[in-house]
Amino acid sequence: FPTLRLVCPHLAGTLPYIVGRLDHQVNVLKRGPRNLARSPVEYLKSIWTDVVSPLPLAIKFGHEFFGPGRLLFSSDHPWVEPEVIVRCVS
């Protein structure tokens, strides 16, 4: 599904933190699918994610990892003060 657009909530959970291990498994140890067109990190950076996190450092990391064009504002509760999110990505 090359045109499928994915949104992973809450800064994509732990994926940005373990994607280096996934890349290593696929590219160095030759485990997993053999016909990937791109590395796991490239696939992960092509998704969209929301910036719902109570930790400003996590929001900043998401901004650096995904880039501002892949971050979405969303809310299911006033969990994080919007001012914190704006301050972190400004």
Task: Go through each PLM region and give its residues.
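H/E-rich (His + Asp/Glu) clusters that bind or coordinate divalent metals
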Residues: 5-90
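Basic phosphate/pyrophosphate-binding loop/patch that engages nucleotide-derived ligands
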Residues: 1
